[in-house]
Amino acid sequence: MIPHRQNVLAALTGIITGRIAQINAVYRGGPSFYFYHRILDLRRQYPTVGAFLASTTCIEILYAALVSWDMNSRGAKMKDYDDFRNNLQGNINVFQSVEAAANGCTWANRSPVVQALADLYDRLSLMKTKKKLVSNSKTMHFVFPAL
């Protein structure tokens, strides 16, 4: 356990939010930055995960965001778009379970959302390779940015 955890988290949050413009200027720009903000904007436009994943545009931008974040380079190979889309849309009910568990979630009652996220992680199959840590965690962040 981290001593004074809440104080440490509050301090880190303050640093990040207070310096976000500087952080953004130093780190990623270009296509990855564009698609990251585009997917977050789209997620805000679609208040339910079911509506978000039913949108062809949202799935396409999600795919492009992952590609721009190097998910289809070096050893990482994403599935073809149709397989990617089918896996996401075939798991809408699992995404909706995360959404339901996250509603009203607090640190004290986090177990249901953690379990729902673990279930979703296990069900996602977005890569041609068996490696899925980065692709699945990025996808889950793009779809559930508040978690």
Task: Go through the PLM ranges and name each one.
Residues 1-129, 146-147:
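An N-terminal alpha-helical hairpin/helix-loop-helix interaction module that forms a charged
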Residues 135-139:
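Conserved beta-strand->loop/alpha-helix structural units within folded catalytic cores of enzymes
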Residues 141-145:
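Hydrophobic/aromatic-lined pockets within catalytic cores
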